[in-house]
Amino acid sequence: MKPNTLPVNFNTIPMELKRIPRWVLWRLVEVGDGENKKWSKLPAQPNGQPASSTDPATWTDFLTAQSAYENDPIKFSGVGFVFSDEDNLIGVDLDDCFDNLTNSFTNAALQQLATSLDGYMEVSPSGTGVKIFTRADLKSAHVDHDKGLEVYPRGRYFTVTGQRLNGSVPQDIQDITPFIPERCTQKDVFRRCQYVDCKDGPAGFAYMGSGHLCCCR
């Protein structure tokens, strides 16, 4: 069964993100076979063609992405923002740490990290995760799946729900070193990108061919 996702509240998305033309749309598509089958957030352009978090030609401006989503909420599940080398914006992804029904954290360690970091914080589409948009001088991704912590400076897009918890995008670069565990592995974000076969997507869905770059959280 297709998972439920939170609707997008465009009014609460920070202007610091809206004014940057690095937006995509995304749709939940079931990929894989048998026990490996899972729902994946595949990026798309407003015309329905595949988008890539490493190809600026497939990105668009905020208003175009918003219009495409609002005009066809069945085709698109939401919108997303791409991180790149153009600026110092980074994304912090905290997995399985939040209960949207009680509007509270379920992981004390990740809650402490989130409340200590200056940035715009919102609930993920699933309602169980938290994303933070901030600024930092970071060259590589830092990933610790055991702790549910991922930090990306480029080559990724984050879904954006506008389901704001608190905070705003800071103007100054933040020192996030204390928030990255020593065991957290540095990764080249481009190596973490993977191709997925989209042939099992819904009929008529634009993701076709042998595979398309899916770099998202």
Language-model-derived ranges and their functions:
Residues 184, 188-217:
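Low-complexity basic/metal-binding stretches
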